[in-house]
Amino acid sequence: MLDGASTAPSEAERCIIAMMLMQIALDTHDEVTDDGGDLRARQLVVLAGDLYSGLYYELLARSGETALIRSFAEAVRDINEQKVRLYEKKVERIESLFAAVGTIESALLVKLADRMAAPQWGQFAYSYLLMRRLLLEQEAFIRTGASVLFEQMAQIAFPRAKTLTKEQKRHLLRFCRRYIDGCREALFAAKLPVNGLLQLRVAELSGGFQAIAKKTVEEG
């Protein structure tokens, strides 16, 4: 994405590091729980998240990247808004649930793509990261029957069901797979100059021929 925007290597490195620091800050804050555990431990986690957030801000402020600071601040706002919606279970449609998940997963990259005048990469990141999350949740649901995402899907689709029937579970899986297929099609339709590693990762996630070939080679 940054290569396509003809970005100077030093600027590209700065943008990537800043985004990574901001993502680490968000992930760290997500580890804070309100389960009444060790207060000091929770405070330390909050401070760690604040540290990463401060490092991100200092890195961009020193180089005068005020526009990127503003863009990332908007991304964090969008992410937090969607997290609150999910936490408070204010989502009434599964389509809206998946849209919220897509925003949470990709908002930082989408804002970076917009900042670099490469919105097509933002769309690519949204589809890729949403597909990745859906696949992880689907796998967890199939293997263990436990998935935060599928739990919310069930509450939306079958609000009166205390325990899901096999058919209801299949219905949720079909719905999820339909969205996974949609993300996969969007990725392959993008026609962007992705590098070999990203191509391989997309193929692995989507269950494409490259992933099958790679697995066959590894198994001898």
From Swiss-Prot:
Molecular function terms from GO: heptaprenyl diphosphate synthase activity; transferase activity, transferring alkyl or aryl (other than methyl) groups
Reactions performed catalytically: 4 isopentenyl diphosphate + (2E,6E)-farnesyl diphosphate = all-trans-heptaprenyl diphosphate + 4 diphosphate
EC numbers on record: 2.5.1.30
Enzyme type, top EC level: transferase
Signal peptide: none
GO biological process, one term: isoprenoid biosynthetic process
InterPro entries: HEPPP_synth_su1
Keywords, in A-Z order: Isoprene biosynthesis, Transferase
Physiological role: Supplies heptaprenyl diphosphate, the precursor for the side chain of the isoprenoid quinone menaquinone-7 (MQ-7).
Record note on quaternary structure: Heterodimer of component I and II.
Protein's name in the database: Heptaprenyl diphosphate synthase component 1
Gene behind this protein: hepS
